[in-house]
């Protein structure tokens, strides 16, 4: 029964692992719901800033903020939002594939690249892959704060204002639904014009201080809020991916336990049959 003992030990080990993955799945569900709430709460802020920027720009067409001016692209910047932990399926791998593909297009056109990396997995990836990482931050926790991101974002904004980069994009996972997380590369600055029905209406605003100074401040806040939104949404996507990965692991463990249990029963039956045969054979010899 040596083989049966090994199988029994393996079954016990897999059951122990199954309990862990099942618990991690439940924790991921709880964290995902909280992340979804933070995601929903932060979205209106960024959208309202975008609307006010549009009103200000329309009301003051003579002033063009640097973040609204297109220029020849010689160097680009990426804010790469990854997770701090693994066990979330192919979430980070798919994100890095999308980023590398976009970077390859820029390099083919002779465009140089600077990187701002959010998350430990992104930092580890670029240590191996290579890349000019000019800013990095990690271990933001389950409830990231926009204040934690301001320093790293400022590095990229200053680079844009100084002319060291000509375009800035954010790379993150979009939370489509519980089963779908989509890696995306979105341009932050120069600001991409989007059709907004509200801008067609007349808004009688009084700006204090003047509209130019207000626009300068709002532009920075807008970029910061977009990066924060990407971090919060990526966190929700991470928890959803981890929930799915742990559920699959739990289900696979159950299948493996069933297969091993069948093998164990067959081995035990064979051992019992052999013992009976030996007893019968011994009795016949007597």
Swiss-Prot record:
Gene Ontology CC: plasma membrane; proton-transporting ATP synthase complex
One Pfam short name: ATP-synt
Keyword NADP: no
Places the protein is found: Cell inner membrane
CDD domains named among the record's database cross-references: F1-ATPase_gamma
Keyword Membrane in annotation: yes
A molecular function GO annotation: proton-transporting ATP synthase activity, rotational mechanism
Quaternary context: F-type ATPases have 2 components, CF(1) - the catalytic core - and CF(0) - the membrane proton channel. CF(1) has five subunits: alpha(3), beta(3), gamma(1), delta(1), epsilon(1). CF(0) has three main subunits: a, b and c.
Name of this protein: ATP synthase gamma chain
């Amino acid at each position: 029964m040596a083989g049966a003992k090994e199988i029994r030990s393996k079954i016990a080990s897999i059951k122990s692992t199954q309990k862990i993955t099942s618990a991690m799945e439940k924790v991921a569900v709880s964290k995902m719901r909280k992340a979804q709430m933070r995601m929903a709460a932060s979205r209106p802020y960024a959208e309202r800033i975008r609307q006010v920027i549009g009103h200000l720009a329309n009301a003051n067409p003579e002033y063009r903020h640097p973040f609204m001016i297109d220029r020849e692209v010689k160097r680009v910047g990426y804010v790469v939002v990854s997770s701090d932990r693994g066990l979330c399926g192919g979430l980070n791998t798919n994100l890095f594939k999308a980023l590398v593909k976009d970077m390859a297009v820029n390099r083919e056109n002779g465009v140089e690249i600077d990187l701002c990396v959010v998350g430990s997995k992104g930092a580890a990836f670029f240590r191996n892959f290579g890349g000019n990482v000019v800013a990095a931050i990690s271990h933001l926790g389950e409830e990231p704060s926009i204040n934690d991101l301001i320093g790293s974002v400022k590095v990229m904004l200053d680079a844009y204002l100084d002319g060291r980069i000509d375009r800035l994009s954010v790379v993150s996972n979009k939370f489509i639904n519980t089963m779908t997380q989509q890696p995306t590369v979105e341009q932050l600055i120069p600001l991409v014009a989007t059709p907004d029905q509200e801008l067609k209406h007349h808004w009688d605003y009084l700006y204090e201080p003047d509209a130019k100074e207000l626009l300068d401040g709002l532009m920075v806040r807008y970029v910061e809020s977009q990066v924060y939104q990407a971090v919060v949404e990526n966190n929700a996507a991470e928890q959803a991916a981890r929930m799915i990965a742990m559920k699959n692991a739990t289900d696979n463990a159950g299948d493996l336990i069933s297969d091993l249990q069948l093998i164990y029963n067959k081995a035990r039956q064979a051992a019992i049959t052999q013992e009976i045969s030996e007893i019968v054979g011994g009795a016949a010899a007597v």
